[in-house]
């Protein structure tokens, strides 16, 4: 562009300088021709030639001026195109740099991530870095001292003083337990499932040769509810670092099961004599101190040798499984109260009613069964379900679902 101006500007300046002179000369020549008579032909011819040359030079300057304007227009279009190209190239370069930054500085390398997840050691290291571990009081020992410190921390943060805190009533808990028992009773009475369950259990039980088949004659599941009261939290005497709740339980109700069987005398030959027997056993009163605590069954003190019973018959129930993880431990204190009402009827024609020896024998066997399973130092362990919310455990009222439709 500068080179073009260098060559064209002198012509433009000359044309602009000569243009007024030529115009003035033309006007003067016209005026001169009109004002006087021209008598000399050579002078007229020279003037005409001069006028033609001026006109030719003017046309040439006009043409060069048009060419200059055309070139300026073309140069402006070329500069516009170059500006557009530069803008596009600049935008593309910025986008490319931004993509490189996101790929290498924001996102992780897929191969590195897969190799890290496949390595067990690195995964454990990452988990240890993710989990926030609070500092514990003391030396952080894993033994009894560390557990005692943990119990003290729990009591401190829950503002509970085990020495001075007054016993609590469990009225709200009694309502929930009563509602649960009521629903169980309603289901048992409507579907007769308790009758079928007991009948199936008795039919599958192995009986001695001198007893005939056992038939159910009476089932009474009661109509009253247990009362829990006087709840207090105490440190466990058997295990350091564990808290337990002691609750007084009182139940005054009538829970009855009646059976009928036959005593068979097989000597000197089978079925020599048959003695009909009818029994009815009722629990009319129970009271005692219930101990409840949460345990971890993976710990050594709650392993199978500690849980196992002494007698071979009562070691473990059939089809039972050893629980793992968090479980509920409960037992009753030895100073419990359990009252029975046993009714018996023996004989076919001449019948013996309520024989004391039979009543004491049955009561002794029932007490032994209860002591071997639930009286301290023995205890029962109930595995607790997972408390994490899950989709399969989610429910909603049926009325809400129908109203939505």
From Swiss-Prot:
The protein's matches in CDD domains, at most eight in alphabetical order, are given as:
SMP_Mmm1
> What keywords appear on the UniProt entry?
Endoplasmic reticulum, Lipid transport, Lipid-binding, Membrane, Transmembrane, Transmembrane helix, Transport
PROSITE patterns with a match to the protein in the record: SMP (PS51847)
BP GO annotations? mitochondrial genome maintenance; mitochondrion-endoplasmic reticulum membrane tethering; phospholipid transport; protein insertion into mitochondrial outer membrane
Subcellular location as annotated: Endoplasmic reticulum membrane
Record-annotated SMP-LTD domain positions: 166-385
* Chain ranges on the Lumenal side, renumbered to this chain: 1-86
Q: Where is this region: Disordered?
A: 303-324
Might you report a single GO cellular component term?
A: endoplasmic reticulum membrane
Which superkingdom?
Eukaryota
Q: What is its main location?
A: endoplasmic reticulum
Residues in compartment: Cytoplasmic: 108-405
What GO molecular function annotation could you give as one example from this UniProt entry? lipid binding
The record gives the membrane topology as: Single-pass type I membrane protein
Family per similarity comment: Belongs to the MMM1 family.
Role played: Component of the ERMES/MDM complex, which serves as a molecular tether to connect the endoplasmic reticulum (ER) and mitochondria. Components of this complex are involved in the control of mitochondrial shape and protein biogenesis, and function in nonvesicular lipid trafficking between the ER and mitochondria. The MDM12-MMM1 subcomplex functions in the major beta-barrel assembly pathway that is responsible for biogenesis of all outer membrane beta-barrel proteins, and acts in a late step after the SAM complex.
Record remark: domains: The SMP-LTD domain is a barrel-like domain that can bind various types of glycerophospholipids in its interior and mediate their transfer between two adjacent bilayers.
Quaternary structure annotation from Swiss-Prot or TrEMBL: Homodimer. Component of the ER-mitochondria encounter structure (ERMES) or MDM complex, composed of MMM1, MDM10, MDM12 and MDM34. A MMM1 homodimer associates with one molecule of MDM12 on each side in a pairwise head-to-tail manner, and the SMP-LTD domains of MMM1 and MDM12 generate a continuous hydrophobic tunnel for phospholipid trafficking.
- Name this protein carries in UniProt: Maintenance of mitochondrial morphology protein 1
Q: What is the lineage of its organism?
A: Eukaryota, Fungi, Dikarya, Ascomycota, Saccharomycotina
């Amino acid at each position: 562009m500068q080179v073009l101006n260098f060559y064209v500007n002198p012509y433009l300046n000359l044309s602009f300088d000569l243009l007024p002179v030529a115009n003035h000369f033309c006007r003067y020549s016209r005026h001169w021709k009109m004002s006087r008579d021209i008598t000399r032909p050579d002078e007229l011819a020279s003037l005409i030639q001069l006028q033609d040359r001026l006109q030719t030079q003017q046309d040439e300057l006009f043409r060069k001026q048009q060419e200059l304007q055309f070139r300026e227009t073309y140069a402006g279009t070329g500069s516009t195109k170059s500006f557009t190209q530069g803008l596009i190239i600049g935008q593309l370069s910025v986008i490319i740099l931004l993509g490189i930054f996101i790929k290498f500085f924001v996102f992780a390398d897929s191969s590195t991530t897969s190799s890290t997840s496949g390595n067990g050691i690195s995964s454990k290291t990452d988990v240890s870095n993710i989990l926030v571990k609070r500092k514990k009081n003391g030396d952080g020992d894993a033994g009894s001292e560390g557990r005692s410190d943990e119990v003290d921390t729990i009591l401190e943060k829950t503002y509970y003083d085990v020495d001075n805190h007054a016993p609590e009533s469990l009225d709200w808990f009694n309502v929930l337990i009563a509602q649960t028992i009521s629903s169980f009773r309603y289901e048992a009475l409507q579907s007769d499932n308790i009758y079928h369950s007991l009948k199936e259990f008795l039919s599958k039980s192995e009986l001695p040769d001198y007893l005939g088949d056992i038939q159910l004659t009476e089932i009474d599941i009661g109509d009253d509810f247990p009362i829990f009261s006087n709840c207090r939290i105490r440190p466990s005497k058997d295990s350091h670092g564990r808290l337990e709740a002691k609750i007084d339980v009182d139940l005054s109700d009538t829970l009855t099961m009646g059976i009928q069987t036959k005593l068979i005398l097989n000597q000197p030959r089978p079925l020599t004599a048959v003695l009909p027997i009818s029994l009815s056993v009722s629990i009319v009163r129970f009271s005692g101190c219930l101990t409840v605590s949460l345990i971890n069954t993976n710990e050594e003190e709650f392993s199978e040798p500690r849980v196992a019973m002494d007698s071979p018959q009562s070691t473990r129930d059939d089809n039972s499984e050893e629980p793992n993880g968090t479980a509920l431990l409960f037992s009753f204190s030895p100073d419990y109260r359990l009252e029975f009402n046993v009714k018996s009827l023996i004989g076919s024609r001449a019948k013996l009613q309520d024989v004391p020896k039979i009543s004491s024998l049955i009561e002794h066997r029932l007490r032994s069964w209860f002591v071997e399973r639930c009286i301290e130092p023995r205890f029962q362990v109930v595995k607790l379900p997972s408390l994490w919310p899950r989709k399969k455990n989610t429910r909603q009222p049926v009325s809400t679902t129908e109203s939505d439709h």
